[in-house]
């Protein structure tokens, strides 16, 4: 189980975004995190994936802190893929950060061989997001945190990306925490919804 226990987080000089926030995601669950813009959902995703450290509370995986070294079993896929890659690396090297990436996965995501030698700025947002998803899934994570991963993509690419993500979660029994402002998507995907209120943020 992925658990946020009593999380308090805020940036220096600002009011805490969260105070004592708790959340649990079980294996195989698809939990949608709902709140208006500006409530800090993206920040919470980063805390849960180990990118940010809370001022109080802890993030636990099966009762233990997330590992500080090696590949994290909780993978975050961000809304803006250009912020998740090194702009100086060609995409082949970006993928190599995950180790050996199965050719079948690349095929399922529609990643073309000619894209491998390109830099991030030479790809569209949808193409770059496919690489970020491949990199995350290649590590065989136990939990996926998807923060508006398809917001800026066309409808066909959105459907394709979500099919790959959901197929992985169903096959591996992985838990998912999703942030999305698309009601049709959340209604179709969610097994449970969690709403953030002012008292929690």
PLM feature spans:
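A short, flexible loop at the N-terminus of ABC-type nucleotide-binding domains that lies
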Residues: 1-4, 8-20
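Helix-to-loop junction immediately C-terminal to a conserved catalytic motif
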Residues: 49
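ABC ATPase NBD coupling module
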Residues: 53, 63-75, 89, 93
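Conserved ABC transporter NBD signature motif
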Residues: 57-70, 101, 198
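Q-loop/switch helix immediately C-terminal to the Walker
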Residues: 80, 87-102
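Conserved ABC ATPase signature
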Residues: 119-123, 127
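Hydrophobic anchor residue at the start of the ABC signature
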Residues: 133, 145
């Amino acid at each position: 189980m992925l658990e946020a226990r009593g999380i308090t987080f805020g940036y220096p000089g600002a009011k805490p975004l969260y105070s004592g926030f708790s959340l649990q995601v079980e294996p195989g669950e698809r939990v949608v995190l709902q709140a208006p813009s500006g409530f800090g959902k993206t920040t919470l995703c980063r805390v849960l994936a180990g990118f940010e450290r809370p001022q109080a509370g802890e993030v636990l995986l099966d009762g233990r802190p997330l590992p500080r070294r090696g590949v994290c079993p909780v993978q975050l896929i961000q809304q803006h893929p250009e912020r998740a890659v090194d702009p100086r690396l060609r995409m082949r090297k970006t993928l190599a950060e995950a180790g050996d990436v199965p050719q079948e996965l690349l095929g399922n995501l529609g990643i073309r061989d000619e894209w491998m030698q390109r830099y991030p700025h030479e790809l569209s947002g949808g193409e770059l997001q496919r690489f970020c998803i491949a990199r995350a899934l290649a590590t065989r994570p136990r939990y996926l945190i998807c923060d508006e991963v398809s917001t800026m993509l066309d409808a066909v690419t959105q459907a394709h990306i979500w099919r790959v993500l959901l197929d992985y979660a169903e096959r591996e029994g992985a838990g998912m925490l999703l942030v999305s402002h698309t009601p049709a998507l959340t209604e179709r995907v969610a097994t449970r919804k969690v709403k953030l209120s002012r008292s929690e943020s």
